[in-house]
């Protein structure tokens, strides 16, 4: 072999090693991205100008920052219409009203902090259909009677399916009866339990996709994260806002972080 060919062979070997090194680095970065926690904006991205909790603006703003999901709370009005609000009560002209005991016409007079009218689920889903990036995480609130919870679950599932949005929507609830109804009405839907009192093994017998617990629950029972993953379940935690808690739940290897501070959570994840 002459010197010219030998030099060429050395260059080719070095080039190949460099390519392999770069490929391995890209693969590791890709795996890190796959393993990184996903962010869910709690009641939408509302800590920003022009937004408010559970407003349509908060949904659109969550979509604009490209988080995994935007969470929203749904009640049934007294006349059977799903409406969007977190608390069990709203205030109208200085008077406190119970959402589930109030007709839609009255609830529509309520204004959110950003001036929006309290939205119906129909309006929220129509706005969501125009979003490009987020999933919608719908929390169905517990009601006084199981019959009302049944009606709420059916109304929500029907409205999602009517718009062919089922691949983009997930469901959560504190109510055992509600999550069971959701599973019955839509066997393929991702359904998660919120209350923090049931083990992954019990949730598996219910056919649920995992749990969405307050972070304090997992601080006391960190083994539930590993057990859930062994059972093929996903783990979400709420509502994680402080830097120290964000880091703790990342270290616990949860799958999703629900937060009022989506940009802070993203910055923390990116630093890992």
Tell me the role of every PLM-derived stretch.
Residues 1-38:
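Bacterial Sec-dependent N-terminal signal peptides
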Residues 30-272:
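Phosphate-group recognition and catalysis centered on beta-loop-alpha active-site segments
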């Amino acid at each position: 072999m002459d010197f010219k060919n030998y030099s060429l062979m050395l260059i080719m070997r070095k080039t190949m090693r460099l390519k392999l090194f770069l490929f391995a680095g890209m693969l590791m970065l890709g795996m890190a991205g796959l393993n990184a926690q996903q962010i869910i904006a709690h009641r939408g991205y509302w800590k920003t100008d022009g937004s408010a909790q559970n407003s349509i603006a908060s949904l659109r703003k969550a979509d604009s920052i490209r988080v995994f999901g935007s969470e929203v709370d749904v009640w049934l009005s007294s006349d059977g219409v799903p409406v969007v609000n977190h608390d069990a009560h709203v205030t109208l002209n200085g008077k406190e009203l119970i959402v589930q005991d109030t007709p839609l016409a009255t609830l529509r007079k309520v204004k959110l902090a950003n001036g929006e009218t309290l939205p119906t689920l129909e309006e929220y889903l129509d706005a969501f259909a125009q979003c490009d990036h987020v999933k919608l995480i719908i929390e169905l609130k517990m009601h006084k009677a199981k019959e009302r919870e049944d009606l709420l679950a059916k109304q929500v599932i029907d409205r999602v399916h009517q718009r062919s949005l089922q691949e983009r929507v997930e469901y959560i609830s504190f109510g055992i009866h509600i999550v069971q109804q959701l599973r019955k009405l839509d066997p393929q839907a991702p359904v998660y339990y919120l209350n923090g009192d049931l083990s992954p093994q019990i949730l598996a017998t219910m056919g649920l996709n995992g749990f969405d617990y307050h972070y304090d629950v997992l601080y006391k029972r960190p083994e539930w994260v590993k057990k859930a993953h062994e059972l093929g379940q996903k783990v979400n935690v709420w509502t994680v806002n402080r830097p120290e808690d964000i880091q703790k739940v990342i270290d616990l290897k949860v799958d999703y972080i629900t937060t009022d501070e989506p940009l802070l959570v993203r910055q923390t994840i990116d630093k890992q």
